[in-house]
Every structure is written in C-alpha cells, then in structure tokens.
Regions:
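Ser/Thr-glycine-rich phosphate-binding loops at phosphate-binding pockets of nucleotides
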Residues: 118, 122-123
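Cys-dependent protein tyrosine phosphatase-like superfamily
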Residues: 1-113, 126-223
Length: 223
C-alpha cells in the first residue's frame, strides 16, 4: 500500500484521518495495519465512478465504503492540471464538500481513510482543506501534500523514457507522477477568488459554520 500515512503526525488524534492510494492490492500486512492498528471504519473514495468500478477497493470486514467523486472524467481529461485543481473548489462542488465534512462530523467509530488512485492529487486537495479547516499551519499542509513525492516511486522504465522525451512530454510526466506546490496554490487562489477567504469557502461551499468547525477541531485535534 503506497502513499499511506496517519495524519496524527501533524498533531491530529491517532487513528482518525488516514490517506493512501487506492486499496485494490492490499496484502495481509496492509489489512492488519488498517483494521487492527488504525481501526479503519470508513473509506471515502474520491475517484470517478469509472475509476471506482475498474479498480475496486478490497472489501474489508466492518468497513463502510463511500464513493464521492471530487472530479468528473471529463474534467480530468480536458483540463490542465492547475485548472483541474481549481475546478475542485468551484461552487458546483458544494454537494461534494458538504458530504465530506458531514461524514467527518458524524464519525464516531474510528478512522476515516481518504484515497483516489495514487492518493496524491484529489486526496491531496481534500486533506489539505480538511487540515486548513482544523487550523493547521499552511506550511505544514504543504509539507504533507508534497510528501507524496517521496512516497510514490516512479517505475524505472518511465525514467528511461524521460531521458529522450520532449519538453511537453516531460511536463505531462511530472504532472502524472508528482505533485507540485503550484498545483495546490491553484486551489487556495481559486478559493480566494470565489469566496473571498478560506473561511468563506467552508461556510459557502462546505455547509460549515462556527459551531461545526469547533466540533471538528474538538473531534480531530490533539488537546
């Protein structure tokens, strides 16, 4: 299981918010880690229905699975990576963000794990904004986001191709295998443009208010 981490290393409570790649190829050690060490109870899959169906998560006993697509197939295929990131926080995504934060508010059983395909882009956006809501320092948020570059290894055959690739091909390669600070910058910039501030985003697009944000902090942050 690649790109896995428990966000407790950021001053969140242990076994509450996890992130990883898709859970299609879990070995026995992965299963034990999720169920017994981290008390996994809910998986939120951010992939499109197509991705959800073609590479299905391994079903673990006692775990609930919810598919909440952050982006559509058309958005992923047609938009540049920065535009795709920005699109994730547009006003037409209100239902998506409201569902995500309602599940966080309602959670009382154990850990919630967020993932997409590689656990770097869609998962990176969602985790970054959850951490923002919890009041985590922006520098720390970016550090966690960029940590995916260390967690995901590029297959050697692709490294060889990169030596002879065009500039455009190299840019596409980097976008596919790595995250960049500029991508996440696009999210926060679009939030400022559309909602005036990060708090405006939480109120207008996520269905949150001061009381709900306080409850989230009490539920997920260390005392």
């Amino acid at each position: 299981m690649k790109n896995f981490r428990d966000l407790s290393y950021i001053n969140l409570k242990k076994n509450m918010i996890l992130r990883s790649e898709a859970l299609a190829n879990l070995d026995i050690n992965d299963q034990d880690l999720l169920l017994n060490k981290h008390n996994l109870k809910l998986v939120i899959d951010l992939r499109t229905p197509h991705g959800f169906e073609t590479q299905k998560d391994m079903q673990l006993a006692g775990v609930k699975y919810v598919n909440i697509p952050l982006m559509t197939d058309d958005e992923i295929k047609s938009l540049e990576i920065n535009d795709c990131y920005a699109k994730a926080v547009c006003e037409d995504k209100k239902d998506v963000w409201t569902k995500i934060f309602n599940l966080l508010l309602d959670n009382s059983d154990g850990a919630i794990l967020f993932h997409c395909s590689s656990g770097k882009d869609r998962t990176g956006i969602v985790i970054s904004l959850i951490l923002s809501c919890l009041g985590i320092n922006k520098e720390v948020i970016y550090q966690d986001y960029l940590l995916s570059n260390k967690s995901l290894k590029v297959p050697f055959k692709y490294k060889l191709r990169l030596l002879f690739a065009s500039k455009e091909a190299k840019q596409n390669f980097y976008a596919y295998f790595w995250v960049q600070k500029a991508y996440l910058d696009s999210v926060f910039s679009e939030i400022d443009n559309l909602y005036g501030s990060i708090n405006g985003f939480f109120i207008k697009c996520c269905g949150l208010n001061e009381d709900k944000i306080k409850r989230l902090k009490e539920k997920y942050l260390n005392d």
